[in-house]
Amino acid sequence: MHRFPPITPLPRMALPARLSRRQVVALLGAGWGCATAPLQAQTVADDALAAVVNGGHRSPANRGRDAARHPLETLRFFGLLPSHTVIELAPGGGWYTEILAPYLRERGRLFAAHYARDDPNAGRRKSRAAFEERLANNPALYDRVKLGTLPEPPAYDRLADIAPPGGADAVLTFRNLHNWLEAGHLDQSLRTFARALKVGGSFGVEEHRAAPGTPLAQMKTSGYVTEDLVIERARAAGFDLVARSELNANPRDTKSHAKGVWALPPTLTNGETDREQYLAIGESDRMTHHYVKRG
C-alpha cells in the first residue's frame, strides 16, 4: 500500500487572544468577491478560521486543549472554507462545534449529527440533552446549527433529519470510528456518510491510532484503530485517501494502558491510579486523514 509522507504542521498565526464576534464576522465576510484571486480567498479563510479559534467565545477549558488537538491546523488540513456545508458527526459536548458554528455561520451551514433523544444508552441520551441545551443557551452562536441524528440500527441508510440539499461539502469525525467499529456498524455508517457528501467532497477523520498489526479484537476494546483498517474500510465505502498528517501524533503514547485510550486525558478513567503518568503522556496518538468521495 502506498504510504503518504507526513505533513508538517502549519504554524499558528499570531492573532490577539480574544476577538469579538463583530471582528470574527468581519473577517468571515471579507474578500469573498475576489473569485479571480483564489490565493487571496484562501488567506481570508485562514485568517477567519484563526480568528474563530482565538475567539473570546470559546471556553477556557476548551482553549486549554488546543495544544493537544490543533484545531486550526486540523481544519485547514481538511480544506474547510467558511462557505461550506458541513456535517459534524457525533459532536459529543461540542468541542469542535464551538469552532465550526461561528466559522460557518455567515456563509456556510453546519449540521450536527448526534445520538438519538431516545437512545437506549443513558449516557448517550444525557450527552444529546446537554448538547441541545448548549445550543439553546447561546443562540447568537448556535442558532443556525441544524441538529440531527446519527445513523443507528436499523436506520443505517440515512442521517435522520439531516439532508443538505445537493450534498455536503465536508463530513467530519473526531475520535469516533472506534465506537462504530466496536458497535459493529462501521462499514454501514461509512457508506451513509459517503451518501451525504457531494462527489469530490471531503471526509475528514481524526482517530486514535493503534500500532500496525493490532488485532481487531484489541482495537474494539482499546479505542485505538490501525490506519490500515481505516483506509481499507473508507475505500470500500467510496472514499479515496488524498493526504494524511502527523498533526495529532503523540510519540509518548504507548497505547498499552489499563482500560485503553480512556486512561489518558481528558477522560482519565483510572482516577488517581498512575494519574501523573497519564498526564505526562498527554492526549492520545492520533491519525489525521483527508479523504474525498469518489465519483
State the predicted function of each range.
Residues 187-199:
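A short glycine-rich, Lys/Arg-flanked "PGG" loop and its adjoining helix->strand segment in the class I
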Residues 169-184:
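A short SAM/SAH-binding and catalytic strip from SAM-dependent methyltransferases
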Residues 159-171:
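A short acidic, Gly/Pro-enriched loop at the edge of an enzyme's catalytic core
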Residues 127-156:
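S-adenosyl-L-methionine
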Residues 200-207:
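Conserved beta-strand signature within the Rossmann-like core of class I S-adenosyl-L-methionine
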Residues 1-19, 23-35:
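N-terminal secretory signal peptides
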Residues 84-92:
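Conserved class I S-adenosyl-L-methionine
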Residues 49-75:
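Class I SAM-dependent methyltransferase Rossmann-like catalytic core
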